[in-house]
Amino acid sequence: YHMTMMPVIFNDCSVAKRLYQEPVLGPQPEPVPGYFGGSDVTPFDDDTQNGDTVGYIPTDDPEMEPVAEAYVRELARTYGQDPRILIWNVWNEAGNSQRGDKSMPMLKKAFAWFREEDVMQPLTADVWGAGAEHPYGWLKMPGIYAEIEKEAIAQSEIVSFHFYGDYEHSRQYIRILEQYGRPLINTEWMHRPYRSIIQTHLPLWKKHKVGSYFFGFVNGKAQFNFVWEFIKKLPDIDTSLWMHDIFHSDFTPYDAEEIEVLKECNEDKKIF
């Protein structure tokens, strides 16, 4: 099928240390109804996104650095010349979950480890609005605010970004990011309640030669159709709309028009 992938290596979207649980193999807990991600233990609650709760990740513990290094180097040596890997996303949303610059030292080291292994694929760490006064407000004032985002761009051979804003603010953000003179990929978008929709945005990305990974595919146990907890009470959010996912669990489209736009944009032709 000529499919490629972008592995995500580290992630700052995290819960408080007292809530952290090590992942396990085998059967997973059944989803809690109504929650994005299928769990009511989430980094997307109001305390973590807008309050004082600071997320924890294992690399916060100094003794985990050798483990992290071995992990990166093994991945790089095994897949660093594999054409199925399109790009390495070294760090997801650095600074999320009130973490500020806590991940800065490890982010720099992780990039260095990949480069020392001489992987053939480009490296990136996405920018997403770290340092903005409020995640929702940032969608109307996109920009680069936090030091950790400036470092992410400095380290990245391809500028990847997450943006769920409407059409006009998406155009504005493209203009900001084009100034860096590197290829652009939006690796998280498509949020119907925020008016980031396939019908308007996918043609925009194609017009500006912006790569695209949108969030969600077939609705299932991850329950990506539900909005994040911290936006449920915002006055202009229609929570009856699916946030992510484009197919029901029986593979029928959520919105047939979206599928037609996807097909058209994936054709090798200009649409403007």
Language-model regions, residue ranges each:
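Conserved active-site loop/cleft motifs that coordinate metal ions or position small ligands
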Residues: 186-187, 212-216
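Active-site mouth of glycoside hydrolases
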Residues: 1-156, 162, 167-169, 179-180, ...
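Residue-level marker of positions within ordered structural domains that often coincide
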Residues: 164, 217, 267
